[in-house]
Amino acid sequence: MALVARSICVSYDEIAGICNNVSHRNFKKWVQWKNPFLFQDDARRNIRFNDRKLSCTKFIGASEKLQHSKSPKSGLISCGWEVNSSKVVSNAVIPKKWNLLKLKVVEVTAIVACTFFVMSSAQAVDALKTCTCLLKECRIELAKCIANPSCAANVACLQTCNNRPDETECQIKCGDLFANKVVDEFNECAVSRKKCVPQKSDVGEFPVPDPSVLVKSFNMADFNGKWFISSGLNPTFDAFDCQLHEFHLEDGKLVGNLSWRIKTPDGGFFTRTAVQKFAQDPSQPGMLYNHDNAYLHYQDDWYILSSKIENQPDDYVFVYYRGRNDAWDGYGGAFLYTRSATVPENIVPELNRAAQSVGKDFNKFIRTDNTCGPEPPLVERLEKTVEEGERTIIKEVEQLEGEIEGDLEKVGKTEMTLFQRLLEGFQELQKDEEYFLKELNKEERELLEDLKMEAGEVEKLFGRALPIRKLR
C-alpha cells in the first residue's frame, strides 16, 4: 500500500494548556496520537503554536527534543514542516478557525511527495509510480483518508510494515484494526479502480488441491445453523477469537453471517462482521465458491477435505481454501468448523489425515478462544500495559549492564547505576499512568469523543501509553 505523510496545523483551542502542563514525553505522545506521521527518523519537522496564552516550538528528529520558546503574540496559527533539515515543502499561515480539511486538500501534492523522504531507495521506483498514480487518479479519496482519524492511523500503521518479512500480513492486521468506510473507499480507488498499487503475485504457498482428496458428497442444507471456527492454520485470516458463523440456504446458495473479534493491544477487543455467499460446484460437491464480490473483487474457493454432520456434539467441517483479490493473488489457509466451541479430541486423527492430504500439519494449527467473554475491566487492561512497560525497562537495563561490563573504564564515573536507571524508569512509568488517568475525563476524553475513535485505534497510536475504554 502507498504511504503518505502530512503537515500539521493544531489550533490553540485543541491544545490549551498542553505545552505548559505536561512533560516532553506526554506531549510527544499527545502530538503523535493526533498526528502519527511526525515521528520519522529521516525527517525534521517544525510545528509552531502561537496564540495569546501559548507559545511553544517542537523540533522532532533523531534526538526528539522538546524546546519552549517565546514568539510574537498573534491570533493566527503558523504551521509547517521541513524535510532533510533544509527544504521547506509546506508552510502556511492561516486564520485560527480555518477548516483544516480544506488546507489538507490543497496540500495533497506535497503530502504524497514527502513519502519519498521516508522510503528506502530500493522502493523509490515503485513509490514514484504509486504516488504519481494516487495524485492523478485518487486525489479525493486520498484527501478524505488524511482527514479521517482511522484512515490516517491505518496509513501510520502501514509504515511500520515496510521491509518486514511479513509485510503483507502486517498490512492486513493494520486493516483489521482501522477498517472503516473511508479506508474502503481509498483502497477501492488505489487498488481496484485505478490499480495504483501492484498486486502481490501467487507464490504457490496454497495450491489448488487434487480433487481426489475432497469429500465425495456434501449437502449444503446440513450446514445450516451456528458453527465455531475452533482451529485455524493462517494466523492472519483464520485464528481470531470468538469466531461464530451462522449459515442458511438462500436461492440455492449458502449464506454465512460471520462474526469475529479483533484484539486491541491493551487486551480489549472489538467485533467485526461480514456476510458471504457460496455456490456449490455442480460437478464437485466438495468445492464451494464465493465470487462476484464488489470490494477488491475478492474470490474465495473452499475445498472441503473432511466432514461429519450427524447432529452430534463432534460434528465438524474441515475447510482448506485459497483466494485472490486486486491486492493479492494466492492467499490461503485452512480452518475447522465445529458445533462445539473447542476441538473434539476424538476427531483429531481424521483431521491429521485430511491436513496431510494438502501438505499441512494439523498439529501446527492454532486453537482459537471461543469463550466469547466480556471485555476485561479497565484495571486489568492498565495492569497489562504497565507490566509490558516494566518488562521493556528491565530489558533496557540489562542491555545497559552489558554495555557497562564490556567497557567499564570508558564509562567511568559518568554512568548511572542500574538501580538508579530502574528506579527512574518506574517513576516515569508511574507519572505517565497518573497523568493519563487524571486527564481521561478532561482534554483527552473530549478529543476522543470528537473523533469518535475506538479504544484500539487510540491505543495503537499511543504506543505504550495507557489503554482507554471504548467510547460509545
UniProtKB/Swiss-Prot annotation:
Changing C138S: Loss of activity. It catalyses: all-trans-violaxanthin + 2 L-ascorbate = all-trans-zeaxanthin + 2 L-dehydroascorbate + 2 H2O. Keywords: Chloroplast, Coiled coil, Disulfide bond, Membrane, Oxidoreductase, Plastid, Thylakoid, Transit peptide. Residues 379-462 form a coiled coil. GO terms for biological process: chlorophyll metabolic process; xanthophyll cycle. One of its GO terms (molecular function) is violaxanthin de-epoxidase activity. It comes from the Eukaryota. The amount of VDE in vivo is estimated to be 1 molecule per 20-100 electron transport chains. This is Violaxanthin de-epoxidase, chloroplastic.
